[in-house]
Regions:
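Catalytic or ion-coupling anion/metal-binding cores of large enzyme and transporter domains
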Residues: 1-165, 169-176
Length: 176
């Protein structure tokens, strides 16, 4: 697949490795900021050796054949297995809006969102509500005693302060 440059991502990255701009930035970090450029962006092997996990993950699969985004470091380490993977098998509760999903979180009745369930919000993508931001949901889940045990799947987006197992930007979006 081509990028906006007309080249593949691989071609762009290979060019960047040898570019004068990259050499300048690495030198600037080293000389002016006293930062080792090799410690700023690392390959997976070096990051793992230092005990770091992926910041973001871009999985594809049967639910997201065109891809999705997970802010991996926002997932509570207590729900990550020994392989470093978050897994959740549970009942999927599907909502057409953030407002409807919030009702299930706030409910005190039988429709209340339960531990282990998977919260799915559809119609929040570009064609739907225009990529609305789902912070209300992630903030509400953070304040549930069992919120870290609930996964959120959506075609909408997340803010930088969102926490938990949030799989967003799912493509294709529900209304595609």
């Amino acid at each position: 697949e081509l990028t906006v440059s007309g080249k593949t991502l691989r071609e762009n990255l290979e060019w960047w490795e040898e570019s004068e701009r990259r050499k300048y930035v690495r030198n600037f970090l080293s000389q002016n900021d006293k930062v080792d450029p090799g410690n700023v962006i690392m390959n997976k092997a070096n990051a793992t050796l230092r005990g770091l996990t992926s910041t973001v993950t871009f999985p594809k699969g049967n639910i997201a054949p065109e891809g999705s985004v997970i802010k991996s470091t926002a997932i509570d380490p207590e729900v990550i297995d020994k392989d470093g993977v978050y897994r959740n098998t549970g009942l999927a509760r599907v909502f057409n809006s953030e407002k409807d999903a919030m009702r299930s979180i706030k409910s005190t009745g039988p429709d209340k969102l339960k531990k282990g369930e998977i919260l799915v919000i559809i119609c929040g993508g570009p064609i739907g509500t225009g990529m609305e931001e789902t912070y209300q949901i992630t903030a509400a889940l953070k304040h549930l005693s069992y919120g870290k045990h609930i996964a959120l799947l959506t075609d909408a987006r997340f803010s930088g302060v969102s926490t938990g197992a949030c799989i967003g930007h799912i493509g294709p979006e529900a209304l595609a």
